C-alpha cells in the first residue's frame, strides 16, 4: 500500500521494506504500522544488521549499520532510503 501522491520508487521501496521487515520480525505484513518504532515489534541489532545486508545485496545500497536506530520507523526508513536512491552516483 502506498501513500497517495507518493513517488513510485518510494511506494515500491515501502512494499519491499515492509515485506522484508515482516519476514525478519516474524510478523504478518499487515501488522506493521509504518509510524510505529520497529523496536516495538522486536527489532534488535541482529535484525537491523540483516536488513542492512539485504539492502546491500538486493538493492545495491550501502547503508550505515546504525540505519534502523537513526531511522526507527518504516516511514523514516523509506524517507531516508528514497533520498539515498535519488542521489547521483559519485556524489
Task: Please place each PLM-identified region on the residue numbering.
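Flexible, low-complexity inter-domain linkers and amphipathic docking helices that mediate domain-domain
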Residues: 1-91
